[in-house]
Amino acid sequence: MTARSEARKFFVGGNWKCNGSVSQVNELVSMLNQCSLTSDTEVVVCPSQVYLQGVKDKLRSDVAVGAQDVWMKGNGAFTGETSADMLTDMGVQWAVVGHSERREKGESNEEVAAKAKFAVDKGLSVMACCGEPQANREAGTTNDFVFPQIKAYADVFTKEDWAKVVIAYEPIWAIGTGLTASPEQAQDTHKDIRQYLAQVAGAEVAESTRILYGGSANAKNAPELSAKPDIDGFLVGGASLKPEFADIINCQTTLKSLKPVNVGINGFGRIGR
């Protein structure tokens, strides 16, 4: 099997979703600050918007902070929204766009792409999500559902924009369910996405853009998934709230000494997905 391109630095994002309290977030930041993390992996954590500044102020400098969503326009009379200008003002570097838990509230492919483009134009990098429901997986029509999501991104991004984009493939049926795409299923879909990206954005973009897997990724399945040539990292949900997140970050390293230290906490226990 062809090895994963070394030009695509391994990437692990942690989506904390709507979880935590001030004390729990502080514990999680403390845990990350005390872990031995390989420098071979780019790491981003995405706390709830209300905790962004606190996490940014306390988190180690080699772990970036991202938002879980971003508004598609600038500042103004948009109650409840968070603009890219606000995020960059507080030093946030990344934003997730197009997560299925946002799309299920009615966001179209075009609206998601507009968010992504506006964020990139304002200086943010984005984790651009895509993924299919179980019905499409079972019907063998995964690409029919996912490719239009990719096309919407390709329609708005310039070639230069793609340097600030990672794609996160998250099969909807595997998010928060405990189900996980097999390494072969995930690799096949990632390969299909990369080949389609070459068609709509060019071969250079397809080769250089990182494609993450999300959907019940954890410390147990991460090593086998990460061995596949088109899987360039993970967007992690529930497991990012636990000490095993460090093992996921380190799953590419052969240095057995890189282990999370025992800091006496169990993450956020059973909350979250």
Where are each of the predicted segments found?
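Glycine-rich adenosine-cofactor-binding loop
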Residues: 261-273
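Active-site loop-to-helix "anion-binding N-cap" substructures in soluble metabolic enzymes
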Residues: 2-257
